[in-house]
Amino acid sequence: MKVGITASKSDDFSEWYTQVVLKAELADYAPVKGLIVLRPDGYSIWESIRTSLDVKLAARGVRNGFLPVLIPESLLGKEKEHFAGFNPEVFWVTHSGENKVGDRLALRPTSETLAYSLYSKWIKSWRDLPLRINFWNTALRAEIKSTKPFLRTSEFLWQEGHTVHACSEEAESEVAAILELYRETVEGDLAIPVITGRKSEKEKFVGAVYTTTMESMMPDGRALQMGTSHFLGQNFSRPFEVKFADKDNVEHFAWQTSWGLSWRLIGAMIMVHGDDKGLVLPPKVAPLQVVIIPISYSGEEGAQVLAAAEGMEAELLKAGIRARTDKREELTPGFKFHDWEMRGVPVRIEIGPRDLKDGSAVLATRHDGKKSKVPLDGAAVNIEEELCRVQTEMLGAAKRALDGMIHDASSYGALTKAVEGGGFVRAAWCGGLECEEKVKEETGADIRVVPEGGAEGACIVCGGRAASIPLFARGY
């Protein structure tokens, strides 16, 4: 395998993506088809997402729990519509050693049925509400389509939150608040802009009253769902008997929400920000934010350069900046430059003998390739400012790219043509399933998101009165 990225992002997007994942050492393929192994840098990015989200969730009173991976078939079938939606994707455990299990066990595709069977035991009174629990775990869903690391795998890391409320209004407020919290995380940490709104009835989560979603557009013109938040109403509390007694001791079925996002965000980050050299990482989630490269290694001069590099590393680490000095003497500085560029490290510091004399170092930023001078003394303040600039500029560039991939269509012909070109297509829709399915069948585009707001004019499919102006797109 050649060291660098050999595929072009614009010419062979799929091969480029795979090379970046493998060569930047984010993940590797497992021996079982459809599964991947997460390597330390890939897991570090996931940990950053998790830490950021945990802080926000804790501020809302959400606590973390753990659920087992095995779910009895009898439990899955309690909410039949929900189960039917996942049945084709379920992995089943039928034996324990040589013995056949009585009730087949599903490897968790999602945890609603398991969690709510327990919630019905835990909740008795209005004093037990609201109940807000989040679970960081894996989900397993057999992928029958072609698989791709982080985007389509049969096992994936995610978080799923499940809350219970005394009234519909509080539950719906929770749904909206979680989606906003997701948006803040994705835009603020991953520098990926999203469009929020609702899913259509056809595309909503199975068993939900409605689903809210955040969607983004990838550079290849295909949409990616970044996270969802569902209002479940009483669709699960009734079959699972999640009930509470109010202050007058009158019993009611509870109102529920569920919500989740997965490591698919890492795939989106790779696609949105990466270039032909490899990864481009937003500083907030980069496992390594600054790499320091000494230019000289030999003699007293080399020792002085290395000492300066290590001194800067210590200063940056003390300031809370993730930094490392590349001390690999067998590799040339040029090779190191390319290697760290491929791995997406946001800032590179170069220190050579001449820099020591000047009392400065060369700072290069990965996202734009710009170089500048930074003083050796007190470098942490300057580098912190650069990291903030990088984070802001990456989000700005991604927003401009997203804006350029949203198109308007005022006729069905314009819609079909725009879908072929890739990106989101904004068009009036009557809200009818028949019109939605016609677009899907003839263009391959789904309704990805229905933003808030009314609509004027006529449905571009049937000519009926428009109910909304959704964004259509082909997706992952």
From Swiss-Prot:
SMART domains: ProRS-C_1. It catalyses: tRNA(Pro) + L-proline + ATP = L-prolyl-tRNA(Pro) + AMP + diphosphate. InterPro entries: aa-tRNA-synt_IIb (IPR002314), aa-tRNA-synth_II (IPR006195), aa-tRNA-synth_II/BPL/LPL (IPR045864), Anticodon-bd (IPR004154), Anticodon-bd_dom_sf (IPR036621), Pro-tRNA-ligase_IIa (IPR002316), Pro-tRNA-ligase_IIa_arc-type (IPR004499), Pro-tRNA_ligase_II_C (IPR016061). It comes from the Archaea. One of its GO terms (cellular component) is aminoacyl-tRNA synthetase multienzyme complex. The keyword Nucleotide-binding applies. Its main location: cytoplasm. SUPFAM superfamilies: C-terminal domain of ProRS (SSF64586), Class II aaRS ABD-related (SSF52954), Class II aaRS and biotin synthetases (SSF55681). It is found in: Cytoplasm. Coiled coil: none annotated. Keywords: Aminoacyl-tRNA synthetase, ATP-binding, Cytoplasm, Ligase, Nucleotide-binding, Protein biosynthesis. Signal peptide: none annotated. Pfam families: HGTP_anticodon (PF03129), ProRS-C_1 (PF09180), tRNA-synt_2b (PF00587). Its EC number is 6.1.1.15. Belongs to the class-II aminoacyl-tRNA synthetase family. ProS type 3 subfamily. NCBIfam families: proS_fam_I. Homodimer. Consists of three domains: the N-terminal catalytic domain, the anticodon-binding domain and the C-terminal extension. This is Proline--tRNA ligase. It comes from Cenarchaeum symbiosum (strain A). The lineage of its organism: Archaea, Nitrososphaerota, Candidatus Cenarchaeales, Candidatus Cenarchaeaceae, Candidatus Cenarchaeum.
